[in-house]
A protein has these predicted regions:
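Central hydrophobic cores of alpha-helical transmembrane segments
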Residues: 106-108, 159-163, 167-172, 190-193
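C-terminal ends of transmembrane helices
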Residues: 4-8, 85-94, 149-155
Length: 289
């Protein structure tokens, strides 16, 4: 099976965190082709993509509250963010749905961007060349999970077992210590995303799910632009004939195939797509056609 088919299966049957990883990697590859200056060794993102600390610019480029989060300043910037996203996203989906993860991620992206713009508007942080990166959104997911299940045990390489609140507190502490040293705008965005993650869980525990803002928006788009459902009731005149009994073997085979698909999907949800064997990946690809 080709690598392309392998990627298609991973995207189709993976969790929301995997889809977000694919989106970020795809955007990074585009940015390398379009905006990377190989002689200088840096990206020169246009103002139509990155987020500027300027309300007047934001008023005419509101989409940058989303686009900035899907581009990264370097490969290692992307790699670290996606490692944390994969880790935090899986933990989040232990308790919540994929729709909620997408909602927290995108709202965290928007609000961390607004925090960045507000900080440079009302606080004297000097000049900023703009903001890119998904760190604020990822911090929202991580802090939301830590707020909901602070005592959850996680195992870290070279460190061992710690509780989720301890790991999250260290990450937040690093941002606070670096707030006035370097990349001030980035750290403000991280902390803004973290604050949203905390507020999201507190409101959720009181019965208000802010992620429905995002899921409701996408549901509305699907209703407006999705395929129209055909009328389920259609008057048909036909001569009645007693249907011939269907072979039992066909039903058994269908049930067996569906059971095998369900078993593979359960394996993906528990251990990830990479845990599948080559035969299982091939079977899933053929079944998905």
């Amino acid at each position: 099976m080709s690598m392309l088919n392998d990627i298609k299966i991973a995207y189709k049957f993976g969790g929301m965190e995997q889809k977000l990883i694919f989106w970020n990697v795809g955007a990074f590859l585009v940015s390398v082709v379009v905006w990377y200056q190989f002689r200088l060794g840096v990206f020169l993102f246009p103002t139509e993509v990155k987020l500027l600390a300027d309300f007047s610019h934001l008023a005419y480029h509101p989409w940058t509250l989303l686009t900035y989060g899907f581009f990264h300043a370097s490969f290692f910037h992307l790699l670290f963010n996606l490692m944390v996203l994969n880790f935090a996203g899986k933990l989040f989906q232990t308790f919540f749905t994929q729709k909620q993860l997408l909602g927290v991620y995108l709202l965290g992206l928007i609000l961390s961007g607004l925090g960045f713009v507000l900080a440079f508007r009302f606080l004297d942080f000097g000049l900023s060349s703009g903001l890119v990166g998904a760190s604020g959104a990822i911090m929202a997911v991580l802090v939301a999970t830590a707020t909901y299940a602070p005592q959850m045990n996680i195992r870290l390489l070279l460190i061992g077992q710690v509780q989720l609140w301890q790991f999250t507190l260290v990450i937040l502490g690093i941002d606070l210590l670096q707030l006035f040293t370097e990349n001030t705008g980035g750290h403000v965005a991280h902390l803004s995303g973290a604050l949203f993650g905390f507020v999201y869980i507190k409101l959720l525990q009181q019965g208000t799910d802010l992620s429905k803002i995002i899921s409701g928006f996408f549901d509305t788009l699907a209703q407006l632009f999705g395929p129209k459902k055909k009328n389920a009731f259609k008057k048909v005149h036909r001569t009645y004939q007693k249907p011939a009994p269907k072979p039992a073997m066909k039903v058994v085979i269908k049930d067996k195939t569906q059971q095998q698909i369900d078993d593979i999907l359960d394996k993906i949800s528990q251990s990830g797509y990479d845990s599948l064997s080559a035969d299982e990946k091939e079977f899933l690809f053929k079944a998905g056609k």
